[in-house]
A protein has these predicted regions:
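A generic local structural motif
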Residues: 75-78, 136-138, 183-184
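A Trp-anchored, charged/polar loop motif used as the substrate-binding/catalytic surface
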Residues: 128-141
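Flexible, glycine- and charge-enriched loops at secondary-structure boundaries
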Residues: 51-52, 129, 171, 175
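N-terminal membrane-anchoring alpha-helices
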Residues: 1-71, 273-275
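Accessory terminal regions of nucleic-acid processing enzymes
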Residues: 19, 236-275
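Catalytic core of membrane glycerolipid acyltransferases/transacylases, capturing the structured
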Residues: 33-60, 68-71, 77-127
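A cross-family acyltransferase "interaction/gating" segment
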Residues: 100-119, 144-238
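Exposed, interaction-prone extracellular/peripheral surfaces
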Residues: 141, 185, 269-273
Length: 275
């Protein structure tokens, strides 16, 4: 709609709208998050519903400024199998709760925060073994009566040519997947998770930066969503201590990555630059 404006001006305008939208929504969400602390179940349920509506409004406003300052063509397949009433959450590192404004929003929206101990830490404190999984399992008790899905970014970092070469990745379009995080989630919530939503994103004109998005330089985004079952043998194993289970789990994750790499190959052919 504002395509007649220079990209730099559109970027500044979009950034301003994003900040204003976030601050206004937070000003309403924060009091509700405090009220939600009261140990009154009906009140907590009501606050949760209102907070979710605020989050949906925030997303709608973000979609609005993206349409205003840009003209992205979305090609999405598979979203019809997603359930609007389901809960799609990210497992977040505990340190992220301290991110200004957004950390409180994540907490208020019941995004589970996880704290994982490194091998070096466990070597110094063996008594802590298993406590991180148990803590996460307790944090997820609230989801036993609520449909929930957990997002996990297996590559763990943004793909660059340098990182791809450094890893000597066997995949054309992907970095090597890190299976520890998803194994941790399945160990903590295995009884509640039976399938995974495999999301693949392709940018025909190359991976954009956040500034590219703000300034209206993103032309097209191709998204493919696939529902895949989680093998029962991948549930309930001890990824940290059981070497056989860890090898089998990594093999399963690698097979998912091989399929994703082939899909990206096809998407690159079907949606070349400028398509």
């Amino acid at each position: 709609m504002l395509s007649f404006l220079p990209h730099s001006l559109r970027g500044v305008l979009a950034g301003f709208l994003l900040v204003i939208n976030t601050l206004l929504c937070f000003s309403v969400l924060f009091p509700l998050s405090l009220i939600k602390l009261l140990p009154i179940k009906p009140l907590q349920v009501l606050c949760t519903r209102l907070i979710i509506r605020i989050a949906e409004f925030w997303i709608s406003c973000n979609s609005g400024w993206m349409a205003l300052t840009g003209n992205i063509q979305w090609d999405i397949q598979g979203r019809e199998r997603l359930d609007y009433d389901g809960w799609y959450k990210f497992f977040l590192k505990q340190e992220l709760i301290w991110v200004p404004i957004i950390g409180i929003c994540w907490w208020a929206l019941d995004f589970p925060f996880m704290k994982r101990y490194t091998k070096a830490y466990l070597a110094r404190h063996p008594e802590k073994a298993g406590q991180d999984v148990e803590t996460t399992r307790k944090a997820c008790e609230k989801f036993k009566t609520t449909p929930v899905a957990v997002f996990n970014f297996l590559e763990g970092t943004r793909l660059t040519s340098a990182k791809h070469a450094e890893q000597q990745s066997p995949y054309r379009h992907l970095l090597k997947p890190k299976s520890g995080g998803v194994a941790f989630v399945l160990d903590a919530m295995g009884e509640q998770l039976r399938s995974l939503v495999d999301i693949t994103i392709h940018y025909p004109d190359g991976s954009p930066t956040f500034w590219d998005l703000l300034s209206g330089r993103v032309r097209k985004v191709v998204v493919r969503c696939q529902i895949k079952p989680i093998p029962t043998e991948m549930l309930g194993g001890d990824y940290q201590q059981d070497e056989v289970f860890r090898a089998n789990f990594q093999r399963w994750v690698n097979s998912l990555w091989e399929e994703k790499d082939l899909l990206l190959d096809q998407l690159h052919q079907d949606y070349p630059p400028g398509h």
